[in-house]
């Protein structure tokens, strides 16, 4: 039987030789060197991922949406009723939410996973990995036990690996849960060492006159639970939530298969911070989709060393940004595989790294 520690030890390193070969190939394509900017760097990054066998390509695509409620909702940190989590999860099964529409446009499947929705019975059409009916209220207790966090991580890692066996080569992460920007801010504050006031934002349109209470709740949660910033599982268990644990599991699972995973917004940055504490080897597999409009986004991304490809003023969550960015991954693969080569043409660009072919 696989353990979390064993799976973390299976995460392969990026292949530098494959990346060097990819860089030489891209430099020789029918264009000035570097003229396709970050698409070129993305192609090199993908080539280094062992799960893609040295050739950037996209097979099946999947967005995994982790759905859970949060006990900290009781502290008045969100204006949406808690029941919206279950209602929106049901809407996802009908394909009518933002992530579902964007994923369909990108040709990706959406996997809606119940890891902790507060309903008496499981919701039909959802993948049931429910740990409990919502996490603990982090302002007065830990979100969950370490054992619960480790088991959910392992379950999601195994589910992700099974999808990879069935042909998924590009993963996206998403979440759904009222009040979940509060535990996300607690995670970001803990791991980055920044004060809660610097990272707590309005989430889903929280009135600004309620922001001080939200900041205070995050500060109380950290003071009470004393999460260890060096221990990603501890941070998730103390001040996180089941949806955040689930997203971290997708990242770890994809990386263990040597495959890329697209981050979404602020919630996914928080999960990534915790996942990287568990295994720094996953960082090269993380691809940032968009810059979240949430207040602490830049702080989290700076700590991760990541620069998003898109800035659309989005803060919906759900995995919407990950779905929106999937065509960018496909574009990087397309230029790598389909562009002609300078060597096969009569174009010579000696030492030229800046000029346009048409100039």
Curated annotation (Swiss-Prot):
One GO-annotated biological process of the protein: cobalamin biosynthetic process
Regions annotated as coiled coil: none
Keywords, sorted A to Z: Cobalamin biosynthesis, Glycosyltransferase, Transferase
InterPro entries registered for this protein in UniProt: Nict_dMeBzImd_PRibTrfase, Nict_dMeBzImd_PRibTrfase_bact, Nict_dMeBzImd_PRibTrfase_N, Nict_dMeBzImd_PRibTrfase_sf
Listed pathway(s): Nucleoside biosynthesis; alpha-ribazole biosynthesis; alpha-ribazole from 5,6-dimethylbenzimidazole: step 1/2
Enzyme nomenclature, EC number: 2.4.2.21
MF terms (GO), sorted A to Z: nicotinate-nucleotide-dimethylbenzimidazole phosphoribosyltransferase activity
Record's subunit section: Homodimer.
The protein's name in its UniProt record: Nicotinate-nucleotide--dimethylbenzimidazole phosphoribosyltransferase
UniProt gene name: cobT
